[in-house]
Structures are given as C-alpha cells and as structure tokens.
Amino acid sequence: MLGTIGVLLAALFFGAIGMTAMFRPHNLLKDFGIETAAVDSRNEVRGIYGGFPIAVSGLLLFSLTRPDLSNGILFALAACSAGMAIGRIISAIVDRHLGKIPLLWGMLEVIVAFLIASNITAR
C-alpha cells in the first residue's frame, strides 16, 4: 500500500498537468494534433486542463490534512482519474484506434487512480 506517497505522486502528476496547461497550453495538446493558436482555445485549455488538475492537486494535498474528509475526497478523485481512462477506452472502441500518446496517458490515468485509491481506508 503506497498511502501518502501515492497521494503525493498523484498530486504532483495533476499539478504538473495543470501548470503546463496554464503557462504552456500549446505544449500540452500538441502531441494529440490539437492546435491552440486561437485565444479562445488557449482559454479552454487553461480552464479545463489547467484549472481542474490544479484543483485536483490541491484537494489531494488537503486530503492528507483532514482524515475525516479524506476517504470521500480520494474516492471521488480516483473515480475522476479512472473515468478519464474509461473515456479513452470507449473512444478506442468507437474509433477502432488508440494511438500511442492516448494509450500512454490512459495508462498514467489508471496508475494515478490506483495511487489515489491506495490511501482510502476502511472505517
């Protein structure tokens, strides 16, 4: 059981995604063939790929300080990470294709879901 280390690694993962989206939005999506040349597209990247992961990272860190709230926080965030991976699987089935980059991100999302879930305790 990875416990606290797993939560810290997951917080680092989401924090890095969020900060990259905030300050280098074009870097985050270029490997997927998505352009962020328009101002509105960068706003979208910063909002969704920046703001959400930064909030997730903050909640993961907060969960380490509040054992009374941690199980709910960790369960919800593990489900979010797993949900992203499930979305990739559904996309691969519908499109009959899964590229190397989406596969890599999907594997990372599954690993992160397990890292987060490893700190959920029975009560």
Label every model-predicted segment.
Residues I5-A21:
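N-terminal signal-anchor transmembrane alpha helix
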Residues I17-T20, R24, I34, A92-G106, ...:
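Anionic, Ser/Thr-rich low-complexity intrinsically disordered regions
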Residues G18-M19, L60-L61, R88-I89, F114-A117:
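Alpha-helical transmembrane segments of multipass membrane proteins
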Residues R24-R42:
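Cytosolic, membrane-interface loops and tails of multi-pass inner-membrane proteins
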Residues S41-G47, L104-A117:
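Small-residue-rich segments of transmembrane alpha-helices in multi-pass membrane proteins
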Residues R42-L64, A79-C80:
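Core segments of alpha-helical transmembrane spans in multipass integral membrane proteins
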Residues S63-L103:
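Transmembrane helix-loop-helix
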Residues A117-R123:
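Juxtamembrane boundary at the C-terminal end of a transmembrane helix
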